């Protein structure tokens, strides 16, 4: 499908989708079946509805923001396949081990006829998150050192990146990008491209600089810049950066004004629940030695234990992206767009936050700037974890972790945000509608009939105008 110049641009987005049958007990919520209950599939419900609606209302893009597959949490069907070919008593057990097993994950994720129709009809863009490879992928230098010492890891990471390039990344590239891509012509001309992809994947894992997974897409007067927040991390000694300097410079070059809207997508939310944001700032400082060597060891254990690995845990990169958002919204990089929106997933709850700027930028006129998080498509948290996530948005928790961050020497951020919608913890799908310089966000919740038996549908959760133009 090509763009209609006289129609609004519609982008559907979400993240974190496990593959499971569309029948009980898998369609039940975790409260009804903690092990198997995944609730209604928002992406599947969206595709079912599309089949019965006017094509003029269909999205122009489906943006999938990570955890399209779960390499470390396989289904019963995939586990049966794994058992048929190797000893699961040896690591990595029932997690995927090689390229062949990755192909099973992708087949299971997208093999349903309804989803095959969706993916054949609507243009897609994707980016990985940790579970596409392994839980907490590239959290820290200590994590990488530990995993590379495992005898099965080299095959896992090589197969994971090779299959990601084939099943996800290749579709992100424009015709011009394909012409410039060093891997595509080798794959196209190789016949059997196994060796080509394995060599590329091994290099992409070992040599961060030189492999760019970030990309940009233009949709008329709207620019989308998708930022890799997993594979390109710099974790060398005292350096902790979300992406290396060359790739960040590329992001800065692409993220400009002179568009009606600038969309920046990153699988990991940039603006977290405030309490978690300050906790990650504190943890990064402590793990780097702010409270001494003994506490640095504790800080690393805490970091890996509760997944403190978002943008706030890479403070230099967080500040650099804040400066970029402010520069675009403030009109310092061309005419300010109608809106700047950061789209994210990962955290298994959905919310909308509006940015404001501090210091020398406070009070200046800016385009509206937002963080829109939509997660999960189908993988809800257990009820006890849902409560913890809600508390992280409340003032008492924020006050405690902000105090800890200041005690560890972390300076106040130049960017602030206020949560206007959420958090909500059901299975969701988000849709952006961009009409000229106007922008509207709609989030819908997936539901099934009582008992989880029957076709899922989508119900409105909230609508929020992001820009009046």
Give residue ranges: language-model regions:
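Metal-dependent phosphoester/phosphodiester hydrolase catalytic core
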Residues: 1-469
């Amino acid at each position: 499908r090509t763009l209609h110049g006289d129609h609004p641009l519609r982008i559907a987005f979400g993240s974190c989708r496990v593959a499971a049958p569309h029948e009980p007990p898998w369609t039940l919520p975790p409260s009804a079946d903690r092990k198997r209950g995944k609730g209604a599939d928002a992406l599947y419900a969206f595709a079912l509805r599309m089949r019965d609606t006017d094509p003029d209302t269909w999205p122009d893009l489906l943006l999938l923001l990570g955890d399209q597959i779960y390499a470390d949490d396989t289904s019963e069907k995939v586990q049966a396949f794994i058992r048929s070919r190797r000893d699961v008593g040896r690591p990595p057990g029932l997690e995927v081990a090689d390229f062949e097993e990755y192909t099973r994950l992708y087949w299971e994720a997208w093999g349903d006829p309804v989803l095959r129709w969706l993916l054949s009809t609507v243009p897609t863009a994707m980016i990985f998150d940790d579970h596409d490879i392994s839980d907490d992928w590239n959290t820290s230098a200590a994590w990488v050192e530990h995993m590379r010492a495992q005898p099965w890891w080299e095959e896992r990471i090589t197969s994971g990146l090779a299959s990601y390039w084939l099943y996800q990344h290749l579709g992100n590239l424009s015709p011009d990008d394909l012409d410039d891509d060093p891997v595509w012509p080798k794959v196209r001309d190789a016949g059997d491209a196994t060796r080509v992809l394995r060599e590329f994947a091994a290099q992409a894992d070992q040599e961060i600089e030189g492999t760019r997974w970030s990309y940009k897409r233009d949709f008329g007067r709207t620019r989308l810049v998708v930022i890799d927040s997993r594979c390109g991390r710099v974790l060398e000694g005292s350096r902790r950066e979300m992406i290396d300097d060359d790739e960040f410079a590329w992001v800065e070059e692409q993220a400009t004004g002179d568009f009606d809207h600038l969309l920046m997508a990153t699988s990991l939310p940039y603006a977290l629940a405030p309490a978690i944001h300050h906790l990650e700032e504190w943890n990064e400082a402590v793990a780097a030695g702010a409270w001494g060597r003994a506490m640095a060891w504790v800080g690393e254990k805490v970091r890996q234990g509760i997944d403190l690995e978002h943008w706030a845990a890479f403070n230099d990169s967080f500040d650099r992206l804040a400066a970029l958002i402010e520069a675009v919204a403030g009109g310092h990089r061309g005419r300010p767009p109608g809106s700047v929106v950061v789209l994210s997933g990962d955290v298994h709850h959905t919310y909308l936050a509006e940015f404001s700027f501090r210091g020398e930028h406070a009070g200046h006129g800016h385009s509206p700037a937002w963080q829109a998080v939509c997660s999960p498509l189908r993988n809800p948290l257990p009820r006890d974890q849902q409560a913890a996530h809600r508390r992280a948005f409340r003032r008492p928790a924020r006050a405690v972790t902000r105090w800890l961050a200041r005690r560890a020497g972390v300076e106040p951020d130049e960017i602030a945000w206020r949560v206007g919608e959420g958090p909500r913890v059901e299975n969701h799908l988000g849709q952006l509608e961009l009409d000229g310089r106007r922008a509207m966000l709609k989030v819908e919740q997936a539901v099934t009939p009582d008992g989880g038996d029957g076709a899922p549908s989508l119900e409105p959760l909230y609508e929020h105008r992001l820009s009046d133009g």
